[in-house]
Amino acid sequence: MQSLPCSIIIPTYNRKKFEKLIEYNILCQTYSNILEIVIADDGDDEMLQLNVPYSINYIKCDRMTIGQKRNLLASKCKGFYIAHMDTDDVYLPTYIEHSVSILENQKKDAVGTSDMVFIYPDGKTGSMRNPLLSMANEATLVYKKSFWDEKHFAESQSSEAIYFLKGRHWQTAHSDIKKVMICICHSTNTVDKNVWKTCPEVELPYYEKHKEILRAINLIS
């Protein structure tokens, strides 16, 4: 059975430094039917130049909250599925394939996780577990376009998915963070991640190629 088309949406603001990481996050995906990349950029630095074999819809927009940008991006998508990619995270090759498989096997409309694993500049790792899908990290979400059509993200600067998912938990499934992403902790994170640095270290999934890129842009030692 042929995979249904998936749009990847990327909100960005002054993230030129992360260009090669963003590019590899897209290129490494094992999902077989990526339709397009949709980018909303309200920054004032250079536009991202991504060498990927997919159509790119690059939207230069006025300054917006992250919730407004996610809604703008979703509104422009042509795919059956929408996959979020934030600019400063490692997305594992299995991310979209794993997420879509859960949607199809469990007959759900959205999937994500509130669990997180972290890598800090000094190489220390950390993790955070949260069983509440109402607090799912927006960066991990994959959902049917029709799910967004029914209800949009809150137009806020953070936690915009709480409203998006509220009252729809029965339509939402939980993904495995170690098949989805690794959060990179750095000085310009939207949310400070240092609070979790005291947590026990964890073994991270394999991400050697990503490591090379992170070292090249001085995000890890």
List each model region and its residues:
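Conserved donor NDP-sugar-binding/catalytic core segment of glycosyltransferases
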Residues: 94-125
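Glycine-rich, basic loop-to-helix element that forms the pyrophosphate-binding segment
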Residues: 61-77
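Conserved nucleotide-sugar donor-binding
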Residues: 78-79, 136-150
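Cell-envelope/extracellular polymer assembly enzymes that use nucleotide-activated donors
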Residues: 4-7, 36, 163
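A conserved acidic beta->alpha catalytic loop
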Residues: 39-49, 86
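Short, well-formed alpha-helical segments that are part of the catalytic scaffolds
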Residues: 14-29
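C-terminal catalytic/acceptor-binding lobe
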Residues: 152-221
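Short aromatic/hydrophobic "clamp" motif used to bind/position activated sugar donors
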Residues: 82
